[in-house]
Amino acid sequence: MDFNDKLATLTRVCLARRVSAGRFVKLTRHLMENEGASEVNPKALFGANTFDLLFFAYVHKLAFEDSLLPPYKLLAYLKVCAYGRLPQLLMYLGKQLQEMDTDVDLGANAGYSYLIQVLVSFMKDAFASGGGMRKRYGTSIAKGFGFFAEVLLTRLGDRMAGVTAPEITSQLAELAKVDATIAGRLGEAWMGLKGAAKTSTTAETVAATVATPTTLTRLYRDTLFESLMFGDSSWNQYGSLFQLISTVYAMPGYPTLASQPVQSRLAIIGEVICAMFDCQSITFLRRDSAKRNNYWKSCIRTRIPRIIRTLFPHSTPEEKTLIQSVVSKSVLGLDQPTVTLIRLSIGSDELDDMFSSFPGGLDVDIRHELVAACISEGVLPKDAFNAIFKDSGISVEALDYADELTIDGQAMSLDTMAEQLSYENLEIGSVSDCLMSKVVAQMEKLSGNAQEALTKRLLVCLADFVQAGNVRPVRYMCQALALNTTAVDIMALCVDPMLLLKALVDCIELWREEEDEANYQEAYTDFGAIVVFAITLKQRYHLDLALLNQFGTLFVGAPSPSSTMPSHELFLSQLLTESDSSQRIFHLSDEQNDQLSGWATALYDAGGISDDLMRSSSVKQFFLVTPAIFQQSMLAHEKGLLSLSTFKGGLEYFLQPFLLGSTVGVFKWLSEQLWVHSQKGHDEQMSTVISVCSTLILTDNTDIEVLSPIHQMVLAICADEMYEALDMALRAGYMVENRVFEFLEPFVSAINYNLNVQRTVSSSGFRSQKGIGMSGGGGSGTKEQTWKYGASMIATIKEQVSSLISWSQNQYTGPPFGYELVMILSSVDTLGHKYVLEQLIEEIALADSNGTGHYTVEVVATIATVAFIISTSVKSPRPFSDSQLILKSLDNMVNDSTGKSKDICVLLQSKILQLLTTAGYKPDGSRLDGKPHAKEDYSFVVNRTGEVENKPINDSSQNSNTDNQFMDTNMFGGDDFTMDFGGDIDMPDLF
């Protein structure tokens, strides 16, 4: 057998065994290495002579994610040899490409320009062919690939590798002859997002007489601090923040900040205070997610006092007086617009602020909490609060702020809390009445030191509960935290959230059902709450299960499962990667089929769910088979074997708390079904899918506050995905009750921005007050909004640059303009670094002719520098890799330009390199390894073993982020969209 025969056999076997797409690609790559093959032949792949959704997933992953099958060859084969399969496959591939993360870097690769040509020519050829069938195929291609072609056209810019704008225009003109609508959309996207071309006037006519400041500007300081928001979970930790401060404010001849002269350290305190208040103001202006607001609020309350303590580790009374003066000046000297934003954020009346003698009126806000936190830290004298706020009429007693935990009006030590948590009777009372909920509710009211102490103690308690097999308090902790995300965000600043996830993963791995279990429903509820909160943590903080083993063990004297097991063997990893319905439902083991049969009988017969049934299979097995239950039930209903009323009646069992945790995977499956049926035009089964969704979402009581805790936790994860899927069904002409959207809207608003999600009369989609930004499923803060700006991308960038220039010209009065740094980064990836850089340099030249060139250089250099820092150092789901090429492109422009244009490029380059050097990056390209990062001290946990070292443990699982994705992934595929064509490709004459 040659390679093609072996590949066809491998494909058939994998499909028969329902092997996942990711695993199939790994097996294919291994086969190619053994056979010496360089790419997949589509003829061999389609030689398997089998066709279903899983095969579609194989094709998509090979062609558009792992690049083993060149896309243009796939399209060529489909055009010639796969007529019977073309519509379904193209619709599937088109949907996958349409749901692709729109900010994934497409790279400067010739293959994409070829793909553009193939797509346009393919559509044109299909439309132009005689015969209705070929034209229908062309329509499918246009619908399926239209969005993807739009994205490619708008992104490639100067990276088109030989495909110039006139060539694209010519191709679109040809396409317009057969379908003006499609051609119009693509042409509008190409010209609109790229922006109207302007005649360059930079080279000969403009003189660049720009001063180069040697000190940090407020703009650069603020953008650099805000870049902390783009990092992974470790950036939340104090060590990373102080490392950044130490680098930015380093002084030659002084090895540490604490060794610098007193006046220098005092100046740093003032700078940091102003920067953090600026950053919080920016989040208010942009209406950012609650997680970001929580981050900066907690930074002000907890990080600033620690920074002062680090700068003055043994402060004298005289030094405390000087510190008080700096803090007072910084707090009382905030710009009035900044103060107004702070006041409005707590619901204060703007008119009260305007006429108050002290900036801020009579309500307590974050400024008062900062001073109280500094007193608690011991860096300010005890009478500092009254001295600073003597004219405000507010005393320290007015703050709902404490240095110790207070429960039911009584002070409680952490030792007492830990003891009572261990022995509390959780069989009676609700979650809101338990001690854990009361403790979590106090988190926001504590001082920074108290928050950190409480967080670490709760983590130790959690680890102890898990090691002892005491799962009930673990469940109550999960529910209490899931319903108070502000407390979770605070805890994530005190310890790495990976530690919290690690404890929960250990609990899940150690889960065993007792043979004499008296209450199986409670056991299922316990497990479901723990799993759902673990998924919430993973999504909210972008955590990677493959990194769990780098944190040692949380157990006393024993290794924990997550410290020793390969990540792909963890149950949570299996649940997140194998929940895809098509991978599992049609190929269940005999044991799973028996379980499915038993559960189906219990759900739809009069007997109901018995303890014997729940005893017959483990809760883990039930979670893995739950999507299959829904799939088989749907098939039975379609075949007339199960009435709709009986179907819905059985599904109502899943609204019981003990089964709700398993519906996370079901919601994922249902959202896929909504899309599948939406693509079929009028589909009788669509009403059934929508009805099932409504059954699982709505309850008899529409008051969200009376939902069970586990129901709220599940909806907090799944609401945004279900909302979009149902909204798509509504746009396709199907009936969806408005109350379903009304019920989901509070969850969607909480997940995304702090703005209300509303539905307009004219459109069923979101009405957003923002453009592109960072938000996400489960409150993760990563899922991108679509582009909402009416102007072109480049016009929007210039508008933001202009606003920042105006702020700089006005001596930085007022809070910074609510700029979208992530939007600027995305625009660079979309339009190409060279094109954006040319446009910004043109702005410098034009501004210089108006006498504002030095302000423009400062703004452009700041944006370029921070973009470069983020793109080269941040481990995030979206690394903005094209921004890494900014400096290289600027180098080329310096070498190629002449005259005044060269002067501008040289000046901008020197300013960027100056800022990069200030930020701790080497200008020669051999940058320091990654972001400023300091190893955190986890000894409060790991030293309990006496032997365990905090060292990474090798994980041979070859598990990638894409294998760990679940709620953040598309159907059958992950977020990481990468293609490597391995150099130039000779384009065959396909047409």
From Swiss-Prot:
GO molecular function, one term: transcription coregulator activity
GO CC, any one term: mediator complex
Entry protein name: Mediator of RNA polymerase II transcription subunit 5
Assembly and interaction partners: Component of the Mediator complex.
Organism in which the protein naturally occurs: Yarrowia lipolytica (strain CLIB 122 / E 150) (Yeast)
Localization per Swiss-Prot or TrEMBL: Nucleus
Family matches, as InterPro entries: Mediator_Med5_fun (IPR014801)
Family: Belongs to the Mediator complex subunit 5 family.
Primary subcellular site in the record, as a coarse category: nucleus
Function: Component of the Mediator complex, a coactivator involved in the regulated transcription of nearly all RNA polymerase II-dependent genes. Mediator functions as a bridge to convey information from gene-specific regulatory proteins to the basal RNA polymerase II transcription machinery. Mediator is recruited to promoters by direct interactions with regulatory proteins and serves as a scaffold for the assembly of a functional preinitiation complex with RNA polymerase II and the general transcription factors.
Alphabetized UniProt keyword annotations: Activator, Nucleus, Transcription, Transcription regulation
The organism's place on the tree of life at top rank: Eukaryota
One protein family per Pfam: Med5
Biological processes per GO annotation: regulation of transcription by RNA polymerase II
Gene expressing this chain: NUT1
